[in-house]
A protein has these predicted regions:
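Non-catalytic terminal and connector segments of soluble metabolic enzymes
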Residues: 1-165
Length: 165
Protein backbone atom coordinates (compact mmCIF):
# COMPACT_ATOMS: atom_id res chain seq x y z
CA UNK A 1 0.00 0.00 0.00
CA UNK A 2 1.15 3.55 -0.67
CA UNK A 3 2.06 6.13 1.92
CA UNK A 4 -0.89 8.10 3.21
CA UNK A 5 -1.71 10.71 5.82
CA UNK A 6 -4.30 10.76 8.56
CA UNK A 7 -5.48 13.40 10.98
CA UNK A 8 -5.38 12.51 14.66
CA UNK A 9 -7.04 14.74 17.24
CA UNK A 10 -6.49 14.22 20.93
CA UNK A 11 -9.77 15.67 22.10
CA UNK A 12 -10.35 17.93 25.13
CA UNK A 13 -11.18 15.02 27.46
CA UNK A 14 -7.91 13.33 26.49
CA UNK A 15 -5.99 16.50 27.34
CA UNK A 16 -7.88 17.07 30.59
CA UNK A 17 -7.16 13.49 31.73
CA UNK A 18 -3.44 13.94 30.85
CA UNK A 19 -3.61 11.10 28.34
CA UNK A 20 -1.49 12.77 25.65
CA UNK A 21 1.69 10.85 26.51
CA UNK A 22 -0.16 7.54 26.74
CA UNK A 23 -1.92 8.10 23.42
CA UNK A 24 1.27 9.18 21.62
CA UNK A 25 3.09 6.15 23.02
CA UNK A 26 0.36 3.87 21.69
CA UNK A 27 0.43 5.59 18.29
CA UNK A 28 4.22 5.18 18.14
CA UNK A 29 3.57 1.44 17.75
CA UNK A 30 2.51 2.20 14.16
CA UNK A 31 6.08 3.29 13.23
CA UNK A 32 4.51 6.18 11.31
CA UNK A 33 6.02 9.65 11.10
CA UNK A 34 4.44 12.73 12.67
CA UNK A 35 4.62 15.37 9.94
CA UNK A 36 2.59 18.10 11.67
CA UNK A 37 1.40 18.82 15.19
CA UNK A 38 -0.05 21.62 17.24
CA UNK A 39 -2.20 22.36 20.24
CA UNK A 40 -5.00 24.67 19.25
CA UNK A 41 -8.30 26.14 20.31
CA UNK A 42 -11.20 24.94 18.19
CA UNK A 43 -13.35 27.73 16.80
CA UNK A 44 -17.05 27.22 16.29
CA UNK A 45 -16.48 27.43 12.53
CA UNK A 46 -13.72 24.79 12.56
CA UNK A 47 -15.81 22.44 14.72
CA UNK A 48 -18.81 22.77 12.42
CA UNK A 49 -16.69 22.32 9.28
CA UNK A 50 -14.99 19.26 10.75
CA UNK A 51 -18.28 17.58 11.72
CA UNK A 52 -20.47 18.93 8.90
CA UNK A 53 -21.33 15.38 7.80
CA UNK A 54 -23.09 14.87 11.17
CA UNK A 55 -25.10 18.12 11.21
CA UNK A 56 -28.45 16.31 10.95
CA UNK A 57 -27.75 14.01 13.90
CA UNK A 58 -29.52 14.70 17.22
CA UNK A 59 -26.17 14.80 19.07
CA UNK A 60 -24.58 17.37 16.72
CA UNK A 61 -24.72 20.39 19.04
CA UNK A 62 -23.31 18.38 21.96
CA UNK A 63 -20.55 17.13 19.67
CA UNK A 64 -19.65 20.72 18.77
CA UNK A 65 -19.52 21.65 22.47
CA UNK A 66 -17.42 18.54 23.15
CA UNK A 67 -14.76 19.16 20.48
CA UNK A 68 -14.59 22.84 21.48
CA UNK A 69 -13.86 21.82 25.08
CA UNK A 70 -16.99 23.37 26.53
CA UNK A 71 -17.84 20.15 28.39
CA UNK A 72 -14.41 19.70 29.99
CA UNK A 73 -13.16 23.20 30.70
CA UNK A 74 -10.24 22.37 28.41
CA UNK A 75 -10.78 24.45 25.30
CA UNK A 76 -8.12 22.97 23.07
CA UNK A 77 -7.14 19.85 21.20
CA UNK A 78 -3.85 18.39 20.02
CA UNK A 79 -3.94 17.97 16.25
CA UNK A 80 -1.42 15.73 14.51
CA UNK A 81 -0.81 14.43 11.02
CA UNK A 82 0.64 10.93 10.86
CA UNK A 83 2.26 9.85 7.60
CA UNK A 84 3.36 6.49 6.22
CA UNK A 85 2.27 3.16 4.85
CA UNK A 86 -1.36 2.31 5.69
CA UNK A 87 -1.52 5.23 8.13
CA UNK A 88 -5.31 5.34 8.31
CA UNK A 89 -5.82 1.62 8.91
CA UNK A 90 -3.00 1.45 11.47
CA UNK A 91 -4.22 4.46 13.45
CA UNK A 92 -7.90 3.50 13.31
CA UNK A 93 -7.04 0.01 14.50
CA UNK A 94 -5.18 1.39 17.53
CA UNK A 95 -7.93 3.94 18.23
CA UNK A 96 -10.73 1.36 18.26
CA UNK A 97 -14.36 1.82 17.30
CA UNK A 98 -16.14 5.13 17.88
CA UNK A 99 -18.28 3.75 20.72
CA UNK A 100 -15.87 3.27 23.65
CA UNK A 101 -18.03 0.53 25.16
CA UNK A 102 -17.86 -1.49 21.93
CA UNK A 103 -14.17 -0.80 21.33
CA UNK A 104 -11.55 -3.45 21.98
CA UNK A 105 -10.55 -2.93 25.63
CA UNK A 106 -6.89 -2.71 24.59
CA UNK A 107 -7.60 0.10 22.07
CA UNK A 108 -7.19 3.78 22.95
CA UNK A 109 -10.95 4.37 23.05
CA UNK A 110 -11.59 1.10 24.87
CA UNK A 111 -8.99 1.98 27.49
CA UNK A 112 -9.74 5.66 28.02
CA UNK A 113 -13.14 6.50 26.50
CA UNK A 114 -16.58 6.55 28.08
CA UNK A 115 -20.21 7.31 27.31
CA UNK A 116 -21.76 10.11 29.35
CA UNK A 117 -25.13 9.78 31.05
CA UNK A 118 -26.57 11.90 28.22
CA UNK A 119 -25.25 9.36 25.69
CA UNK A 120 -22.37 11.42 24.29
CA UNK A 121 -19.29 9.40 23.31
CA UNK A 122 -16.20 10.81 24.98
CA UNK A 123 -13.75 8.76 22.99
CA UNK A 124 -10.59 10.88 23.53
CA UNK A 125 -9.32 10.70 19.92
CA UNK A 126 -10.40 11.33 16.36
CA UNK A 127 -8.83 9.48 13.43
CA UNK A 128 -9.75 10.15 9.80
CA UNK A 129 -12.08 7.48 8.41
CA UNK A 130 -10.61 7.28 4.90
CA UNK A 131 -8.23 9.04 2.50
CA UNK A 132 -10.86 11.54 1.30
CA UNK A 133 -11.79 12.53 4.86
CA UNK A 134 -8.10 12.72 5.78
CA UNK A 135 -7.36 15.19 3.00
CA UNK A 136 -10.39 17.35 3.83
CA UNK A 137 -9.67 17.30 7.57
CA UNK A 138 -5.93 17.95 7.28
CA UNK A 139 -6.64 20.95 5.05
CA UNK A 140 -9.09 22.26 7.68
CA UNK A 141 -6.68 21.92 10.59
CA UNK A 142 -3.30 22.74 9.00
CA UNK A 143 -1.82 25.17 6.50
CA UNK A 144 0.47 23.53 3.91
CA UNK A 145 3.55 25.22 5.41
CA UNK A 146 2.76 23.60 8.80
CA UNK A 147 3.32 20.12 7.33
CA UNK A 148 6.88 18.92 6.75
CA UNK A 149 6.00 16.91 3.62
CA UNK A 150 4.02 18.04 0.57
CA UNK A 151 0.92 15.95 1.16
CA UNK A 152 -1.31 17.78 -1.27
CA UNK A 153 0.94 19.77 -3.58
CA UNK A 154 -0.52 22.99 -4.85
CA UNK A 155 -0.21 24.00 -8.48
CA UNK A 156 2.55 26.45 -7.46
CA UNK A 157 4.50 23.72 -5.62
CA UNK A 158 4.36 21.43 -8.65
CA UNK A 159 5.64 24.24 -10.91
CA UNK A 160 8.46 25.04 -8.42
CA UNK A 161 9.48 21.38 -8.27
CA UNK A 162 9.59 21.09 -12.07
CA UNK A 163 11.82 24.17 -12.26
CA UNK A 164 14.30 22.73 -9.73
CA UNK A 165 14.41 19.27 -11.34
Amino acid sequence: MADQATLILIKPDGLKKSLTGNILTRLSETKLEIVASKITRVSNELARDHYKHLKDKPFYEDLIKYIRGELHDRRKVMALVYWGEDAIIKCRSLAGTTNPEEADPTSIRGSYGRITTSGLYENVVHVSANAEDAEREIKLWFEPEDIIVDLYPTKEAVIREKKTS
